Amino acid sequence: TTYTYDLNNAGTTETFPLTEGDGTYAVKVFENTSGTKYAQAYSTSVTMTLRNDFLPFLYPNQFVNYTSGSQTVSMAAELCKDKSGDLDKVTAVFDYVVDHFTYDYDKAATVQSGYLPDVDKVLEAKKGICFDYAAVMSAMLRSQNIPCKLVVGYAGEIYHAWINVYIEGVGWVDRVIYFDGENWTLMDPTFTSTGKRSNSIMKYVTDESNYSQKYAY
């Protein structure tokens, strides 16, 4: 799998996670020479053995960018302060985003390649695209020490973003959050929010065949 990132030229430190597990990663840096043409400026390889498989999904990175002082982190702390377990915390964060955020159709129609969410601005506006929803929830859950993957792939034929969460005692739960004692319900915060949890939307998001993962951040 090839992950492509835009590098800033402002001298700002950024984090790019190695999310495909243990192994050897090829790292290449390309410089824009003119127009859409690029030349390779640097290459190396990195062999990684994780001391903890969750580490890439517990810290900020370029796509899930937050600090201890972020408003998103403060909101997560407020939502989770009386929650006793990971599942309760995940449910609280999910319900907050689904019930308070609206989908930004204008932004979706004009967003440019290379767009990166500003989680605090999204939280303040209470609206965004699927990438924004997933980034805000990922930041909130990671700040609560709950491993969370921001996943990019396809929902049907639509390029889309959602989250996978690790629940203590259960393991990685792909695209899901709610357990009613028998079944998990898929967690796709964008569709659930825009569809107001209608029967047709819930039927769609609970069908795993509608989703195809490409990248995890």
Descriptions of predicted regions:
Residues Y25-T49, H100-L116, D120, C130:
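Short secondary-structure boundary segments
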Residues K89-V93, K126-L141:
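Active-site nucleophilic cysteine motif
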